[in-house]
């Protein structure tokens, strides 16, 4: 059966979301049609607002609606430690843990030559520039996911930082191979940070 064009377009739009297949997209489209008009308007406004008002912090790459994110602008954070993560959602996981009070640097991806993602496509250059300009940093924690891409990215960054004589550490074993940091519980993350090892 062919759906009317507006419904087909909405189904197609939902299918662009990760993990959403045609059946789920169709259910969401019909659910959206049954929503009160005000809820649909609020939903569409929220989508537009996120695209218009959220940007990357120019210092660390975290997402923010301010000029500089709350973490970078907080003088009470430990200025001597920077934790490098893949995505803002990983940063949020460590913040929810509540044990780490240093700074962050968000790469927005990992090296993946097969996908055409090299050092220029993620925030590696800005990390090195940041370290060169900041003498306060004594340790960089590489908190990347335990995937082949995450491992190779960690080794690449480690080699770039070593000449600066800054301590480079990585999370302790405890996160299962291939698992995402965002799904790890707070206790696992806390142990991984506390037991971090030098590279």
From Swiss-Prot:
Toprim domain residues: 80-176
Zn finger intervals (C4-type): 57-72
MF-aspect GO terms: DNA binding; zinc ion binding
Keyword match rRNA-binding: no
Protein name in the entry: Recombination protein RecR
Assigned keywords, A-Z: DNA damage, DNA recombination, DNA repair, Metal-binding, Zinc, Zinc-finger
Similarity comment: Belongs to the RecR family.
Record function comment: May play a role in DNA repair. It seems to be involved in an RecBC-independent recombinational process of DNA repair. It may act with RecF and RecO.
SMART domains to which the protein is assigned, alphabetical: TOPRIM
GO biological process: one example: DNA repair
Cross-referenced InterPro entries: DNA_Rcmb_RecR (IPR000093), Rcmb_RecR (IPR023627), Rcmb_RecR_Znf (IPR015967), TOPRIM_dom (IPR006171), TOPRIM_RecR (IPR034137)
Pfam family, one: Toprim_4
NCBIfam families: recR
Gene3D superfamilies cross-referenced by the UniProt entry: 3.30.60.80, 3.40.1360.10, 6.10.250.240, RecR Domain 1
